[in-house]
From Swiss-Prot:
It is an enzyme of class 3 (hydrolase). Residues 8-98 form the Acylphosphatase-like domain. InterPro entries: Acylphosphatase, Acylphosphatase-like_dom, Acylphosphatase-like_dom_sf, Acylphosphatase_CS. It catalyses: an acyl phosphate + H2O = a carboxylate + phosphate + H(+). The lineage of its organism: Eukaryota, Metazoa, Chordata, Craniata, Vertebrata. Its EC number is 3.6.1.7. Belongs to the acylphosphatase family. This is Acylphosphatase-1. PROSITE patterns: ACYLPHOSPHATASE_1, ACYLPHOSPHATASE_2, ACYLPHOSPHATASE_3. It comes from Xenopus tropicalis (Western clawed frog). Keywords: Hydrolase. Gene3D superfamilies: 3.30.70.100. SUPFAM superfamilies: Acylphosphatase/BLUF domain-like (SSF54975). The active site is at 23, 41. Pfam families: Acylphosphatase.
Length: 98
């Protein structure tokens, strides 16, 4: 059986997600799940990024972004868009962008 192609999805998380180590915890959770991508703060108080990896692991991370986050965060919603299958991963690590 051939290995499933990875997927890529963009995300934005709303609520109290800045100043609460959200990016650090997002990077750690992405690494734990074996995902690659990036995370950054926006000027509007949200956190955005991209996830890439096996669809099952990306789904786990999406739930984490919607419901858990960092210990002091308060997530009001998470939006996901531009989901697509990719031939190969476009990132080599899960990075925090400044």
């Amino acid at each position: 059986m051939a290995e499933e192609e990875p997927i890529s999805v963009d995300y934005e998380v709303f609520g109290k997600v800045q100043g609460v180590f959200f990016r650090k915890y997002t990077q750690a959770e992405g690494n734990r799940l074996g995902l690659v991508g990036w995370v950054r703060n926006t000027d509007t108080g949200t956190v955005t990024g991209q996830l890439q990896g096996p669809s099952e692991k990306v789904r786990e991370m999406q739930i984490w972004l919607q419901k858990k986050g960092s210990p002091k965060s308060r997530i009001t919603k998470a939006q996901f868009q531009n989901e697509r299958r990719i031939k190969k991963l476009e990132h080599s690590t899960f990075s925090i962008c400044k």
